[in-house]
Amino acid sequence: MKESLDFAISGAEIEIADKSVQMALDAGASAAMVSLDKAKTEIYALLDGEIDNIRQTGDRSLTFNIYADGKYGTFSTNRFEEDSLRDFLCKAVETVRMLVADPFRGLPDKKDLATDAVNGDEMGLCWYGYDSVSRDEKLEMARRVSVFGEFSAPSSDRNWRVVSEEVEYNNTLSDTYLTSSDGCRCRQTETSFEVSSQVTVEDNDGNKYTGLWWDYGVSPEKVLTSECGRKAVEMAVMQISPVNADKGKYTMVVSRLVSGRLLQPVLNALSSLSVYQKSSFLVDALGKQVFSKGLNVMDMPLEKGKSGAILFETDGRACRNREIITDGVVKENFTSIYMSRKLGIPPTSSCPNRPVLQPFVSEELLGGERGGGHCGVNGDGFDGSGLGGDCGGVRGDGRGSELGVASGAGFGAASGDGRGVERGAASGDGRGVERGEMSGSGLGGDCGGDCGEVFGAVNGGERGVEFGAVNGGERGTELAGGLGAERGLKADPFVNEIAQKDILELCGSGILVTDFNGGNCNSATGDFSYGVSGFLFENGKITSPIDSMLITGNMTDLWNSLLAAGSDPVPGMSRQIPTLAFRDVTFNA
C-alpha cells in the first residue's frame, strides 16, 4: 500500500503556505499564521434503491491570521499563485492597520507550540488505501445497505411497509497544515468512509415514521458489513402506535445517540469568553462543586485512533488531556490565548476537542451496596485514583472502558477551524449535523454493534417481524437486548460495561428519550426547554413509544440530579457522551 494520498496537501502547497507567511511579513505584518486546508468528498446517493445522484466536491483554502501595529485581522483565499497571494496579503495588512489596536492579540508563546504533529498521520486517523477503492466498489457499498425492495411491498406478516428510503455513501479526505512566523509547523490528515440510511415507514392506518442509522470508519471495513438499512427500519417501526404519556416528573434516561445535547450547554458555559461577558450560567463556578459528584468530564484529544483526536490546537499550541469537571467540581474553563492575556489567567484549550463523560452509578440506584462512584482513566497524565474512582475501570482494564473505538472526521470538509473534524457538512452536502445525533431515534442498548435483532417489547403486539428471525410473533422481550433474551442485572456494574439496558433496569420506570425535537437552553441562566420523543419503560423494559413531550428545567439542577452515566458512548463521535439517567425531570404533554 502506498504511503501517500492523491488529493492530500502536496509539497508544493506546503511550500507556498510557508512562503505566504514571509510575504505577510514583507507586506508589513509583525506576525502571521496561515492554515492550509484541503478536503475532498465523494457522495453516492440512492433513492428507493436506485441511483439518485453522484457528487464530488473539493475545497482548498489558505486562512491567514495577520498581526500588524498591535492590530489583528483574519483573511481567507483560494488563490495559490504567488503574485496573487502577494497582492492579497498587501491589501490584508493595509486593512488590519485600519482597525483598532488590541494589545492582547498575538501568536502563542513558542514554548507552548506542538512539535510532534509532523506528518499528519500521528493520530492514526488516516488510511493510505483511500485511493484504491474503485467507483464500482463505492456504489456497491451503497447498494448493499438498501432494503427498499425487501420491505416496500405490503405483507401479511407485518402492519407496515417502507414507503421511502434514502441511502448515502460518502468518503472524505481532509488535510490541514498550520504554519506561522514563530516556527509553528503542524499537520493533521484524516480519511473517513461512511454509509447512512434514512427510511420512512407507513403503518396500516397511513401514519408515517422515520428512522435513520449510519456506520463509519477511517477505512471501509465497517461500511462493507453495515446493516444500517435494517437498523434504520427498526428505528422507524419501533415508533408505531405512540401513546400519550401523562405530564409529571419522571426518571429520564437519555440515549447515547442524543445525550451530548444535554452536556453541550455546560461546555458552552465554561468558555472564558462567555464567563467574561456574563452570558454564562457558570460565571462563578471555577473551583466550586456545582454539579453532582457523579459528573466527571475530561477533554481527551490525545487518544490515538479515536474520534476527535488531535495533537494541536487551532492556534498551534500542543493539546493536552485535561480534567474539566471532577466530582462535580469545575476544574477548568476553556480559555484561548486571547482571553488568557485579557484576563491574566493561564490558557487552556480554546474549546473542547474530545470531551469524554466518565461512567457513574449513583448510590441511589445501587441501593447502597457499593455507593456511587465513577471510573478513573489512567495514562496521559491522569490517575484513576486521582479522579476519585473506586474501580480500576468499567472493563477491568484500568482505562474506564476505552470510551469509544472508532475515529472521526465529520461528514467532511474542514470548516475554517483548521481541523475538518466533525465540524459540519461535507463540502456542500447540506447536513451540518454530527454523526449519531442526526438519528431520529437511537434505541437499543448495544446499538453500536447488535442493535436489536428483534424489534423489542413495544406494546407487546402485532408489529412482530424480527430481522433476527426470532419467533415471528410477540416482538421479543426487550428492546435493548438483542434476540429478546432476558438479561439480569450484572452483579457488579463497575467490572462490566454499563449499557442502556443496564441503566433502564437500574432505574426501573420512567421515560427513555431518543430524540430532541427543537428547543433551547438560555446560556445566561441555564433554563432549558426541549421537545423530546422516546419510550415509556417499566420494570426496566420498554413498554410503548410516546408522542412528543416537552422537558423543562435548569441545567445546573439537571446535572445535580444525575443518577447514572454509562460506558457506552457511540464510536465515531468526537463527543464521547454515554447513556445518561436523571431523577425527577419535568415532562409536559
Name what the model sees in each region.
Residues 1-404, 408-412, 416-424, 428-435, ...:
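N-terminal small-residue-enriched
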